[in-house]
């Protein structure tokens, strides 16, 4: 944890070597990045090992990287995979740290003001702080992030100014250290030593860094000199050895030097005067009173405490930006030569473009009715054109790239169509709509007899429900996956499908990325000739691809005519299948079924209670730590259980029962990891 940049190389751990289309994809991607190409696309089919390809590119070029995923679930999967590939390097996780978030809003029609309400998850906050620290300190850093990365973060210049640099032999007064820690928003707690706190015992100061999970630093002073710096386990007190120097980072990204706060207050006062004059001129006296009262209260809080509720709304002044300038984000912490990888780019890119507009609409109402100053509009996510300017060299990764990625990449579309397993894209059949229900019933029975699974996608909720009832009445074990089901329950349903609890899964939009089930040998697309979002070329290719992990994969499209989208999807699937077949023949490869155990593919996002249930269904009961048998169902229950275990752990530590405390710490690690993936 030196102040100098750590230049350790990436070391990739894997039992496999690149095969299929992976070697040429790795070579081409790396070559383009070395040549300075700004945009390229990895067009990788389902099951072709796109993440492994990207990991090889990062290791080969030895450059820091950010992986953007469209949601927390996929971000967690990528994080777990990258951690497995690079156990010796810094693989970090950066997603929204809110368990619950209700932004402030005003509804003019009913004159209703909704206060901001939020619950911050300490574990995710620690991981976010660790991510920015790794970017600032280490070259061997991979940060897996959600679209949260384009939202405003503390100004990196202020953040770096506030750091406390400690060095053995340095002359520094104990009071200076304590005052600096208070500036960094650390709190003194001599009883409960927790993340973001420090304690003092004579001339020894112990600090538990905000970004650390299991290491604290001890400062041993001799008069006004730092005699020794060492790292230790904050729970057991066991030492990890001395270090020559250590840097303490602020407890939050939003920490601001006192001088900057005082400057900001003066600018806020000037804007308040201007806004009051505007409201009086427009005869909006209620709004004038409202903005005066709220802003003056915030100013007083900032003056006395250094922060206020909703301080992010004054971020323009706190970061010293001009009106309309982009807010500082995670991109400002990235090294200039970092690589950006946008996973499932056909979903992620449109998300990035849509964030700004929704946020702007809500804030304009708050400004218009006197709840916020106009400068609050600059507390926002990046606009798409700002994101484009800030983004470093970019690789778009998708099985179905969007028009934007294809246009940006030009001719640099790298195909990764051949799978290492030799599996082919599914065969496609077109059958008439008039027989779709009865034909599907017959196909489902055939697949169930072979212990294979079926995915069925319909156009409407009612049709999905009716079809589920019909199949159920005719003896088919069937479940219906709908939009009200949360992520954890969704993973449990998929797990039950894989385990053979039922044979057919019906849904409206089953193309969601990550729904890869090797046991599925048939995908049935009802009313495939109805043009629209759910039957577009991209949606059809994604849905057909759900059967691509099975040796007997087939897709049946029920249609009375062939639409342009169907034609393009069929042509593309056949192109891939021909290329895969030719490669297999040339290299003597026999397609192999994907025989991964259920646990291997679905450990992420699954609670321990589901694990126990699955083991029981297989006639076994695994011994899990006691605390995890009744796994929490939601974020609130997780927090309660974590706090309860922490209290027990600290109690054992105070009573010097370190073995018991360490056992509970292991349970906490498991529970926190499970929480990250479940949420």
From Swiss-Prot:
Question: SMART domains, per this entry?
Answer: DEXDc, HELICc
Pfam families tied to this protein: Helicase_C (PF00271), ResIII (PF04851), UVR (PF02151), UvrB (PF12344), UvrB_inter (PF17757)
Locate the Helicase C-terminal domain: which residues? 436-589
Q: Where is the UVR domain?
A: 639-674
Q: Please tell me which stretches of this chain the record labels as motif Beta-hairpin.
A: 97-120
Protein's GO biological process: nucleotide-excision repair, DNA damage recognition; SOS response
PANTHER family, per this entry?
UVRABC SYSTEM PROTEIN B
Record's comment describing the protein's domains: The beta-hairpin motif is involved in DNA binding.
According to its UniProt record, which protein family does this protein belong to? Belongs to the UvrB family.
- Protein name per Swiss-Prot or TrEMBL: UvrABC system protein B
Identify the species of origin. Haemophilus influenzae (strain ATCC 51907 / DSM 11121 / KW20 / Rd)
